Amino acid sequence: MTDDFAQDGQLAKAIPGFKPREPQRQMAVAVTQAIEKGQPLVVEAGTGTGKTYAYLAPALRAKKKVIISTGSKALQDQLYSRDLPTVSKALKYTGNVALLKGRSNYLCLERLEQQALAGGDLPVQILSDVILLRSWSNQTVD
């Protein structure tokens, strides 16, 4: 795993401009050990350390379920849409990944149905919107 962070490692070979950093390698070792032992880990590292790759690479190499929690949706989107595909491709990762968000980010079908049933009490524009939303909710899978 730490070879991934070497000058000629998988990350350097696959990611243009990648430069190995000792603090990044040390963090990757700590993350690997925590995953192997099934122990929690809290890491504090400065800007530019390479924290994202330092936890993503060991998580992908672990062949175990790993949860990565972010402090904001923006960081979650960056991680899932940019960093994860980059590291996955570099490490030739073929496993599954999933993006999970809190329930406040999803439509509650039960509440939508309640609003649709209470249609007589709603202004016309809102009722129209509820009907469109209800139709849309039957077409989506996520």
Regions found by a protein language model. Give the residues of each.
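Conserved structured core elements
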Residues: 21, 25, 47-53, 69, ...
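Residue-level recognition of well-ordered secondary-structure positions
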Residues: 25, 57-60, 101
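Walker A/P-loop
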Residues: 36-55
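Aromatic side chains
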Residues: 18, 53-55, 106
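A substrate-engagement module of RecA-like helicase motors
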Residues: 1-14, 65-142
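Conserved pre-motif I regulatory segment
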Residues: 1-42
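Short, surface-exposed connector motifs at secondary-structure boundaries
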Residues: 37-41, 62-67
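Walker A/P-loop NTP-binding motif
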Residues: 32-33, 52-65, 82-86
